[in-house]
Every structure is written in structure tokens, then in C-alpha cells.
Amino acid sequence: MVQQESRLKVADNTGAKELLVIRVMGGSTRRYANIGDVIVATVKDATPGGVVKKGDVVKAVVVRSVKGARRKDGSYIKFDENAAVIIKDDKTPKGTRIFGPVARELREKQFMKIVSLAPEVL
């Protein structure tokens, strides 16, 4: 489960490598984030010369989760890591590339640009 203080891998080319979750968006009592949920996070590790720097506060969407998500047909989708993509305020990614597979649930939550950039949608 992704919650406050969780650390996530960054699955794009913005220059950030790791994020620390500050808040899960969606109300003051919202505790956990799953695939397709927006979070506010800070950059804990970044490569030099990237778009974002260490210490920047960013919005991101969770694209892979170890806990996984239940689908309408009863199946589950789970991943080996928790990963997020840094986004702008209009739900478009800050980076120009997405690394690794993303879940189909992002299409239902209207993150079309992330889905189109991803190399694989599971």
C-alpha cells in the first residue's frame, strides 16, 4: 500500500529517481493510494541536469503497485515495485518517456498521455 512516507521509484525521464509521499490526494481522511491515484511527493534522489531537482515538491500518479488492483472480471494485477510518474496540473506527464509497464486502470482515470507513452499496458 502506498501511504504517507512511502518511497516510490520514478518511471519517467524527468531526472528524479525516488519519491517520498507527502500526501494522498482526495480528502483529509484518505490514507492509501493505489494504481491511478494522484499523490503529492518530494524528490529524494535525482540525476544531475534533470527537469526536477532533489527537494522539489511534485504531483505524481501511481502507475505500479505491489498491492495491486482488483479488476471488474475478478482478476488482480500486481507488480514487483511501487512506481509513479511525475505529472503537471493538467494530468499530463512532465517527462517525455515512460519506463516499464503501466496498468490499464490509468486509461479509465483519463491519464491518456501516460498510457500512450508507455511501452506496455497490462
UniProtKB/Swiss-Prot annotation:
An annotated Gene Ontology molecular function: structural constituent of ribosome
UniProtKB keywords: Ribonucleoprotein, Ribosomal protein, RNA-binding, rRNA-binding
UniProt KW RNA-binding keyword: yes
GO BP field: translation
Cellular component terms (Gene Ontology): cytosolic large ribosomal subunit
PROSITE patterns on file: RIBOSOMAL_L14
Gene3D superfamilies assigned: Ribosomal protein L14
Keyword Zinc-finger: no
InterPro entries (alphabetical): Ribosomal_uL14 (IPR000218), Ribosomal_uL14_bac-type (IPR005745), Ribosomal_uL14_CS (IPR019972), Ribosomal_uL14_sf (IPR036853)
SUPFAM superfamilies for the chain: Ribosomal protein L14 (SSF50193)
PANTHER family in UniProt: 50S/60S RIBOSOMAL PROTEIN L14/L23, LARGE RIBOSOMAL SUBUNIT PROTEIN UL14M
Function of the molecule: Binds to 23S rRNA. Forms part of two intersubunit bridges in the 70S ribosome.
Oligomer status and interactors: Part of the 50S ribosomal subunit. Forms a cluster with proteins L3 and L19. In the 70S ribosome, L14 and L19 interact and together make contacts with the 16S rRNA in bridges B5 and B8.
Family under the similarity heading: Belongs to the universal ribosomal protein uL14 family.
NCBIfam families: rplN_bact
Protein name: Large ribosomal subunit protein uL14
Organism: Agathobacter rectalis (strain ATCC 33656 / DSM 3377 / JCM 17463 / KCTC 5835 / VPI 0990) (Eubacterium rectale)
